[in-house]
From Swiss-Prot:
The lineage of its organism: Eukaryota, Fungi, Dikarya, Ascomycota, Pezizomycotina. Disulfide bonds join 39-57, 217-233, 343-348, 367-376. One of its GO terms (cellular component) is extracellular region. This is Polygalacturonase. GO terms for molecular function: polygalacturonase activity. It comes from Penicillium griseoroseum. Residues 1-20 form the signal peptide. GO terms for biological process: cell wall organization; pectin catabolic process. It is found in: Secreted. Its EC number is 3.2.1.15. SMART domains: PbH1. The keyword DNA-binding does not apply. The active site is at residues 215, 237.
């Protein structure tokens, strides 16, 4: 009897042990959670290690990383909720290629610069005065593509070889406290160093950027619900819509540019559409814009661009409607033009201008198709 009880007890304990086996699963779960930890990468191997480990880290800190020549710091496809922090100085090896130097994508992503951090493109190695129009092949800097409900903040970019931020396919993306400093390019052949190029995005909010460059401070080529506020733009070509037309997406709808200063630039406010193309520009507002030291045009709106240059002949395929200019004021050089409007017949309508005062330059005798509510 005792022997039978003993055997029964052993069998019972064994069955209990088997039934208890699933209790080990929470331990595995805990292990999986800890794999999404904070990771720090640095030095010449930092880029490769970060790329390899990017989906295993909840926080990716890049400390004085040296990105090899011809390599993208590829942080695309990050897990939702990942934070990327740049510390110290991030540098990039030299090679003639198209780039980008950095690329980030994902949902609920935060990209931020620590205090004193800098992404230094050392663009003078590529600058030849030609930008993307010839000469050396130059890498674009930062692709912010396919970012959803994300933010990029307190990033300082120094001396980009060519265009800086390419924002494409973004939804609800905020960029705040961004500095784009390519001032050295003024005297060293910097060209086409656009700060922010926006395309095919819905909900882009760029606040308080400080920009010194040699091309557009902002260029919205397509997209909806784009807000550009509190910008300080120096040098370059002004704050632009377009050129619109000739791409797969040719709709600009709902752009607000507000409380910005533009100084020592070729242009102030600029809207340009492509000759012979189709598309739409509507719901654009420029409000509380201050211009100073503008060399060519204080306000320039034209529907005649072809191959990057004006033709003098506007076409109506990309109408410009519901355009508001409110308190846009400032000065243009005596050799420049205060306001220039070149619209095809009936292609510009429903414009509202108030408090617009551009002085110092010449009055254009070539304006055409000026809609009611505007003056040239």
């Amino acid at each position: 009897m005792a022997s039978s009880l003993k055997l029964g007890l052993i069998a019972l304990l064994g069955a209990t042990a088997v039934n208890a086996a699933p209790a080990a699963e929470p331990v595995l779960g805990t292990s999986l959670l800890t794999s999404r930890a904070s990771c720090t990468f640095s030095g010449s191997s930092g880029a490769a290690e970060a790329i390899k480990s990017k989906t295993s880290c909840s926080t990716i800190t890049l400390s004085n990383v040296e990105v090899p020549a011809g390599t993208t710091l590829d942080l695309t496809g990050l897990k939702s909720g990942t934070t990327v922090i740049f510390e110290g100085t991030t540098t990039f090896g030299y090679k003639e290629w198209e780039g980008p130097l950095v690329s980030v994508s994902g949902t609920s992503i935060t990209v931020q610069g620590a205090s004193g951090a800098q992404l230094n493109g050392d663009g003078a190695r590529w600058w030849d005065g030609k930008g993307t129009n010839g000469g050396k092949t130059k890498p674009k800097f930062f692709y912010a593509h396919s970012l959803t409900n994300s933010k990029i903040e307190n990033i300082y970019i120094k001396n980009s070889p060519v265009q800086v931020f390419s924002i494409n396919g973004a939804k609800e993306l905020t960029l705040s406290g961004i500095t784009v400093d390519t001032a050295d390019g003024d005297s060293n052949g910097g060209h086409n160093t656009d700060a922010f190029d926006v395309g095919s995005s819905n909900g882009v909010y760029i606040t308080s950027p400080i920009v010194h460059n040699q091309d557009d401070c902002l260029a919205v080529n397509s997209g909806t619900n784009v807000h550009f506020t509190g910008a300080q733009c120096t040098g370059g070509h002004g704050i632009s819509i377009g050129s619109v037309g000739g791409r797969s997406d040719n709709t600009v709808d709902g752009v607000t540019v507000e409380s910005c200063t533009i100084k020592d630039s070729d242009n102030g406010v600029r809207i340009k559409t492509v000759y012979g193309a189709t598309g739409t520009v509507q719901g654009v507002t420029y409000k509380d814009i201050t211009l100073s030291g503008i060399a060519k045009y204080g306000i320039v709106i034209e529907q005649d661009y072809e191959n990057g240059s004006p033709t003098g002949t506007p076409t109506s395929g990309v109408p410009i409607t519901d355009l508001t200019l409110d308190n846009v004021h400032g000065t243009v050089a005596s050799s420049g033009v205060d306001t220039y409007i070149l619209c095809a017949s009936g292609a510009c309508s429903d414009w509202s201008w108030s408090g617009v005062s551009i002085t110092g330059g010449q009055t254009s005798k070539k304006c055409k198709g000026i809609p009611s509510g505007a003056s040239c």
